[in-house]
Amino acid sequence: MTLADTIFKENIKKIMEQGVFSENARPRYKDGNVANSKYITGSFAEYDLSKGEFPITTLRPIAIKSAIKEVLWIYQDQSNSLELLNDKYNVHYWNDWEVGDTGTIGQRYGAVVKKHNIINKILQQLEANPWNRRNIISLWDYEAFEETDGLLPCAFQTMFDVRRVDGDIYLDATLTQRSNDMLVAHHINAMQYVALQMMIAKHFGWKVGKFFYFINNLHIYDNQFEQAEELLRREPSDCHPRLVLNVPDGTNFFDIKAEDFELLDYNPVKPQLKFDLAI
């Protein structure tokens, strides 16, 4: 069993057995009912990517390509435009969070990256001094939140650090999320930011190191309990999936494309499970 599958099962079991129920929940299901959840707080996981430990479960299929395309939309295009996400990447799951008839998700994610020139600043800082301890992406922008409606960012902070080991430089990353839908989005979010970590490492010709993942509120929605029990019953596949980025070292961050990524040795358990999302 992979580390990711072990952590996934442990978290599901902990939420189901020790979690508490939300109150006054904001989200709604498509039928209009309140989307309450069972949750735990303070979830942490550590993966050593350099040793082949990737945060993706084999207990159900995970849509990696669309997840990576979302990262490109946020950090390369630096956009909040749903038209761009739909037309350029053929990714449509953000459409449910459109703000009014604006065609956007509000001043969120890519709009905040562009507003503060975040990615260019991170790349410039790492180039000037890789060992500086100030490489932080923060999407938590109160001014932007007051400017428009929109879903507040779930994965809102990423920190980067480097280590030199036996002459090689390794890039580590720490992702912080305020909230995470354990069954649906956990591995999507984790692998998105592993992809971002890999892109930055490639830009400088470094190796990927460790990925640290902290979630403040890790939850399972109350219409997903049957799926949770099914996942606990499933036996993981005998495979060890790993994500690779097939571009030369030194490839410019902004030149990397979704098709440059390849998920190897991934044979997840089927059938896929269905989930009614909370909006």
UniProtKB/Swiss-Prot annotation:
Give any single GO term for biological process: dTMP biosynthetic process
Q: What is its main location?
A: cytoplasm
Keywords attached to this entry: Cytoplasm, Methyltransferase, Nucleotide biosynthesis, Transferase
Which residues are noted in the entry as dUMP-binding? R133, R134, R178, S179, N180, D181, N189, H219, I220, Y221
Which residues are listed for (6R)-5,10-methylene-5,6,7,8-tetrahydrofolate binding in this entry? D181, A278
- Active site (UniProt): C154 (nucleophile)
Role played: Catalyzes the reductive methylation of 2'-deoxyuridine-5'-monophosphate (dUMP) to 2'-deoxythymidine-5'-monophosphate (dTMP) while utilizing 5,10-methylenetetrahydrofolate (mTHF) as the methyl donor and reductant in the reaction, yielding dihydrofolate (DHF) as a by-product. This enzymatic reaction provides an intracellular de novo source of dTMP, an essential precursor for DNA biosynthesis.
Describe the family membership recorded for this protein in Swiss-Prot or TrEMBL: Belongs to the thymidylate synthase family. Bacterial-type ThyA subfamily.
Q: How does it assemble?
A: Homodimer.
**Name of the molecule in the record:** Thymidylate synthase
Its source organism is Streptococcus sanguinis (strain SK36)
Q: Which gene encodes it?
A: thyA
